């Protein structure tokens, strides 16, 4: 089968590990701290975690979920907790999990939002595959920007330094713990984690051989401004510009009415949002309408049109793409609720203006210009020249959900075009090292209405076959040279079984229903 190389790697690792008993592995772990003498690294603990035990998360603070995020270990591993000093005003916390079923592969996980919290779920997922796995708190604990206030060192950790330094430390620990060192290094992250992956590609092209970057928060500063812009468009609840959640439901139904069948199948899922250019004047209330919850006033129709339009600066230059249609049910509670967006608010309060009293209702495009002019430590992570990564032989699998209600998938398509234009490469030339997969029916880093479980984490596991598992797909691409032509997603039922599967096309191709089977038949679709 296609994933034979993974199983061989696991079997080989198991054979190596079995030469030493669990007792010797436990002893090795408990004494490992004596071998760690790395600059600016303070070892907090080394803990042996046996199979079937609760994974200790004693350093995970309540603001990050505390011990509530604990899970049962399916393997035995050595858990190393450390603090790493990055300046006289900053440090980050990290953990390295070193499994007994080690496959010779190193992996770093990313973060989300403005956190601040180790991605323990991703660490569990990767470690069970035999990766020596690390995760950091990205320079501060908690999903908040308050630690950025008047502290550029903490911002630098968040922008790139915690991940890069953690990777350097993690690789050193891996070499210390395993005599054979590591063969290949990988990265797995989504959202902020996706941005971190791209920042590593752009600034540290030798850090990873393979990167899985999902729904990346690239063009980060303008993304923050885009999040602030929605309040300006919608106004507060009760204003004539405000659209209620019930009306957004009507908007969603109208979008599906106009766009669902464009891919050839009426299944409640939009396969290519680029083709979806809805007209909302069809929802205008007539003079006799009694129920105004399912129609729009002219002012409200203008609000909806603005929501689905790109953001341009005071000078008329493009800043950020439109929100893709199809995400409005979730986005109505995130961006269109008539309140500020937390991450955008925090960025302006604690970074742009260093003023915790800044009022999000005052935001204008002048603020967007001020924020963009700063772009501290190039956190926007939108550099189109990734030739260093290309020359290093790196591979990146980039995915983005087409129902993402937090970061529009149009941003990923814009970055793909930016890379192509900057490097002067065609899609077939980019294919050698960079492939983008828009995933229909996927929300923000997680399943939505469609076949969107693609193995990016434990909660979206649908098998070990590389076509069903993006982590295994990047391993196969790096180690066997077999690049993914598609990513097959699974629609999971509540009991954990698979309802149906669908192959998601490599951009810029799009999925088209051609029959003759039902839309749930993966072979009834074709990439065109």
Swiss-Prot record:
Q: Which GO terms describe its cellular component?
A: extracellular region
What's its top-level EC category?
A: hydrolase
State if Nucleotide-binding is listed as a keyword: no
Q: What does the record give as the reaction this protein catalyses?
A: feruloyl-polysaccharide + H2O = ferulate + polysaccharide
The EC number of this protein is 3.1.1.73
Give the binding site residues for Ca(2+).
260, 263, 265, 267, 269
The protein's superkingdom reads Eukaryota
Spell out the molecular function terms from Gene Ontology: feruloyl esterase activity; metal ion binding
Q: Which UniProt keywords apply?
A: Calcium, Carbohydrate metabolism, Disulfide bond, Glycoprotein, Hydrolase, Metal-binding, Polysaccharide degradation, Secreted, Serine esterase, Signal, Xylan degradation
Give the GO terms filed under biological process for this record.
xylan catabolic process
- Disulfide linkage: 29-78, 64-117, 190-445, 259-276, 285-295, 505-527
Q: Which PANTHER family match?
A: FERULOYL ESTERASE B-RELATED
Which interval of the chain is the signal sequence?
1-19
Q: Which family does it belong to?
A: Belongs to the tannase family.
Q: Which residues form the active site?
A: 191 (acyl-ester intermediate), 404 (charge relay system), 444 (charge relay system)
Q: InterPro entries, from UniProt? A: AB_hydrolase_fold (IPR029058), Tannase/feruloyl_esterase (IPR011118)
> Can you say what this protein is called?
Probable feruloyl esterase B-1
Q: Which residues are glycosylated?
A: 83, 101, 286, 354, 385
User: Tell me, what does this protein do in biology?
Assistant: Involved in degradation of plant cell walls. Hydrolyzes the feruloyl-arabinose ester bond in arabinoxylans as well as the feruloyl-galactose and feruloyl-arabinose ester bonds in pectin.
Q: Where in the cell is it found?
A: Secreted
